[in-house]
């Protein structure tokens, strides 16, 4: 979990921006979206192979 302490004389917007950057860098939001719904192993394999196919195409 990301934690951000508001510094002295720092606006709330700046602290929020630092927090969002930390969350993005840690991959927390992406991981949460990925785990939001259960995905069967067969569907995971299919999605993984499609991503690899797209990556290989370029």
From Swiss-Prot:
Entries under InterPro entries matching the protein: Ribosomal_bS21, Ribosomal_bS21_CS, Ribosomal_bS21_sf
GO cellular component: ribonucleoprotein complex; ribosome
Pfam families xref list: Ribosomal_S21
Superkingdom of this protein's organism: Bacteria
Key words of the record: Ribonucleoprotein, Ribosomal protein
Gene3D superfamilies: Ribosomal protein S8
Ranges of Basic residues composition bias in the record: 43-58
GO BP annotations listed: translation
GO terms for MF: structural constituent of ribosome
Renumbered residue ranges of the record's region Disordered: 39-58
Protein family: Belongs to the bacterial ribosomal protein bS21 family.
NCBIfam families, alphabetized: S21p
Protein name: Small ribosomal subunit protein bS21
Biological classification of the source: Bacteria, Bacillati, Bacillota, Bacilli, Lactobacillales
